[in-house]
Regions:
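Intrinsically disordered, low-complexity boundary segments flanking structured domains
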Residues: 1-5, 52-55
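Generic structural detector for well-ordered beta-strands
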Residues: 12-18, 69, 111-113
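HotDog/MaoC-like acyl-thioester-processing domains
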Residues: 75-76, 85-129
């Protein structure tokens, strides 16, 4: 990674809630509301999008930790928007403050941590195990 990643960079991601994004999709006894795993995934994409301009050829960013609260329900047809803002980093980890909104309320917030890796090097190390 040759480019310095500045604090305050922002990324966004959004999706319209469909049945496949709901608890009910996974279990018919649960309500058809937006699932926490889908919200977290969208928050991760927002953070990944923030990092894209700073990655060198062959690099990707991967999630390494999450600490998120799901605070309000969201129903099918609602648009969920997430934003990630880089709050801190060291040589290895990038910590983003993340929020999710459904147009009516904040539905989630917390932090996600990402690291930059080279998938080819990871595969090479894994093959040696």
């Amino acid at each position: 990674m040759a480019k310095k990643v500045p604090l305050g960079i922002r990324g966004q991601a959004e999706e319209t809630v469909e049945h496949k994004h709901t608890l009910n999709h996974h279990h018919d006894k649960l309500p058809a509301i937006y699932s926490t795993p889908n919200m977290i995934g969208l928050m991760e994409w927002a953070a990944a999008n923030a990092m894209l301009p700073f990655l060198d050829e062959g690099e990707i960013s991967v999630g390494t930790a999450i600490n998120v609260e799901h605070r309000a329900p969201t129903t099918i047809g609602d648009l969920v928007k997430t934003e990630a803002v880089l709050e801190s980093h060291n040589e290895r980890f990038y910590i983003f403050r993340v929020t999710a909104h459904n147009g009516k309320a904040e539905i989630g917030r917390g932090t996600v941590t990402r690291a930059i890796v080279n998938p080819a090097k990871v595969a090479e190390r894994h093959a040696k195990r």
